[in-house]
Amino acid sequence: MAEKFRVGITRDILDSRGEPAFGPAALSILADAPGLEWEYLPAVVRELTPEHAARYDAVYVNMARTPATAVARADCRLRVVARHGVGYDSVDVPAMTRAGIVVTNTPMAMPRPVATIALTFILALAGKLALKDRLTRTGRWDERMDNMGMGLTGRTLGVVGAGRIGKELLRMARVFDLKLIAADPYVNAVELSYIGARKVDLDTLMRESDFVVTIPLFNDETRHLISTAQFALMKPTAFFINVSRGPVVDERALIAALQAGRIAGAALDVFEQEPVDPANPLLAMDNVIVTPHALCWTDECFHNMASTGLKSIVDAASGRRPEFVVNADVLTHPRVLSWLAR
C-alpha cells in the first residue's frame, strides 16, 4: 500500500478555541483528497525545522519562517511550502529551489482585502476618525470645530507599488474623485492609464500626494524604500500609509518626520518589528492609526486564501503543477519532475 501524502498546518493559524481562523469549509479540500492525510503541527513554532521537513510532504504556513536549515538534511521529504498569503519573505526561496521544493502563495485572494484596508485608512485619516472617537469618549464634544477633516475631491492619492493590490486600490479610489498617481518601475504608463492613473517617479509621487500608500512587494530592492529623503519631500498636510511590509519603511525616519511635524499623520498595519514593541513611539502618537498586521483578516479573505493555498497542496499530491508557484525555476528540478511526471 502506497504511503500517504502527509500535510502539516502550522498552529499559528488557529484561533483561541483551537479552530482554523479560515473556517471549516476550506479543510474539506484536504479531507476529500484521496491518498492524503493532514494534521496541525504539535506546537506553535516561529520557524520550521528539519524534523518538520522530514515528517511532511507539504506544509501550509501562516507566519512561521522557513529557513534553509529546515531542508538541509538528507531525510527531507518536503515537496511544497504553501504560504497562507501573498508575501513570501518569510521563506528562503533560493534554498527551497536548490532543494527541489515548490513554494506557493495566494495572490488572487489578496488584492480586494488589502486595497480595502488602505482605503479604510485613507478615509479614517481624512476624517480624523480616531481623534473624533477620543473626543466623544472623553467629553470633549465642543472641540469639534477645531478638528476639521480633509475633503477628498481633487486630492491626490499616490500608490507606491502598482501590482495587483495597488491597481485594485487605484480602481476603488476613483469613486472619490481623487487624482491618481503611481510609482512602480515594473508597470508601464499605458497600463496605469487604463485605470485612470498617471505614472510618476517616486520623488514626484512623494511631493504631489496628499495620501501616500506603500504596497510594493518586499525584497532587498524595496527594503527602506521610504526613508528620510522621501519623507522630506511630502507636504506637511499629507498622510502616509503602509499596508505592505514593515521594513519597506525606515521606521526611525517615519517617527522623526511625525515628531517634527513634517507630515500630518500616518496609518500602519505593519511594523519593522512584529509583534510591535509596546514602547514604540508610534503607539503614543494621536495622529497615527495602528493595527496588528491583521486589518484585512476577514472571514472572506481567510477562506479564499486557505482554499487557494490548500488546493495547491492537493495539486502537488496529485502530481499536478500548483497554480501559483513563486519559484518557477524549481519546476525543472529533477526532484520536482519525479512527482510531476507520475
Language-model regions, residue ranges each:
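Short beta->alpha connector loops at strand-helix junctions that form conserved
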Residues: 84-85, 101-112, 184, 203, ...
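Phosphate-binding beta-alpha-beta segment of Rossmann-like dinucleotide-binding domains, i.e.
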Residues: 99, 107-156, 171, 175, ...
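Rossmann-fold NAD(P) dinucleotide-binding segment
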Residues: 65-78, 221-239
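Rossmann-like dinucleotide/phosphate-binding beta-alpha-beta segment
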Residues: 144-236
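Short glycine-/small-residue-rich Rossmann-like dinucleotide-binding loops
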Residues: 64, 86, 216-218, 244-245
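Rossmann-like dinucleotide-binding domain for NAD(H)/NADP(H)
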Residues: 237-239, 243-342
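N-terminal glycine-/charge-rich "phosphate-binding" loop or analogous flexible N-terminal tail
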Residues: 1-58, 333-334, 338-342
